[in-house]
């Protein structure tokens, strides 16, 4: 059983990246074949594959632009347009090379495999590349962020929602929101909180009036980092 997690880079220090890495780690710890595939970056995209958090050594990482370069038709179609996105903070052009790679990935999957999409762009590209043919693998799209404010992401997800098997929220309050806004069956909605691990933070409490050679006690504190998405407008 293989789990593919499509990501828009794993270099940033934010909740989305940490959630993606922790999800990959959790599957790898269970002995599954896990592959993080990056969708952004130029040339090889390698600059977006330096994780700021611990990544399980068995998790494979690749950029989609650098996969299957041994297939002649993949190399020859790098200058043929396939997909473009022009959002305020996300602009990218994807050649037909990406289409061939996504088709190749689909051809290698079975009913026991899963794909997790962390951004609706990845979902739409996968659907278009495979000509709307239902994937053999289970398709899961995760909701990260505020989709009422990120209207472009909302629109992409809305037109591709029927292609996925499950829509995963990271907050149980979002289940009814998703059902209401996208009119999808409740059995396709899954609440799975972000997989998080405690981070040990050391805090030194010092008294500035004590002598320099006096021992200072160290207190250990633990903090959990996670994110909660919503499609509710912010107040």
Label every PLM stretch briefly:
Residues 168, 215-235:
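Conserved donor-binding/catalytic core segment of Leloir-type glycosyltransferases
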Residues 115-116, 163-172:
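A short beta-strand/loop micro-motif in the catalytic core of glycosyltransferases
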Residues 13-14, 198, 232-235:
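A short, basic/aromatic alpha-helical/loop segment that forms part
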Residues 7-13, 26, 32-92:
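N-terminal strand-loop element at the rim of the active site
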Residues 95-102, 115-134, 149:
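An aromatic- and histidine-rich active-site surface loop
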Residues 1-2, 203-224:
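Nucleotide-sugar donor-binding and catalytic loop/hinge architecture
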Residues 96-101, 138-163:
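Nucleotide-sugar donor phosphate/pyrophosphate-binding loop at the beta->alpha transition
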Residues 173, 195:
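Carbohydrate-associated surface elements
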């Amino acid at each position: 059983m293989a789990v593919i997690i499509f990501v828009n880079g794993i270099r940033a220090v934010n909740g989305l990246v940490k959630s993606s890495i922790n999800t990959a780690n959790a599957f790898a710890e269970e002995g599954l074949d896990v592959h993080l595939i990056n969708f952004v970056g130029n040339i090889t995209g390698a600059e977006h594959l330096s994780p700021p958090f611990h990544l399980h050594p068995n998790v494979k990482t690749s950029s989609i632009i650098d996969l299957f370069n041994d297939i002649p038709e993949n190399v020859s179609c790098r200058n043929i347009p396939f997909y473009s996105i022009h959002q305020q903070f996300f602009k990218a052009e994807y050649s037909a090379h990406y289409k061939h790679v996504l088709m190749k990935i689909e051809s290698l999957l079975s009913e026991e495999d899963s794909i997790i999409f962390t951004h609706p762009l990845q979902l739409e590209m996968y659907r278009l590349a495979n000509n709307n043919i239902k994937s053999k693998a289970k398709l899961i799209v995760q909701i990260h962020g505020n989709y009422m404010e990120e209207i472009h992401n909302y629109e992409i997800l809305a037109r591709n929602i029927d292609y996925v098997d499950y829509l995963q929220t990271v907050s149980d309050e979002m289940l009814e929101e998703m059902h209401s806004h996208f009119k999808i069956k409740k059995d396709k909605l899954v609440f799975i909180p972000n997989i998080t691990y405690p981070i040990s933070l050391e805090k030194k409490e010092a008294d500035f009036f004590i002598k320099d050679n006096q021992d200072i006690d160290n207190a250990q504190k633990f903090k959990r980092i996670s994110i909660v998405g919503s499609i509710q407008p912010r107040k």
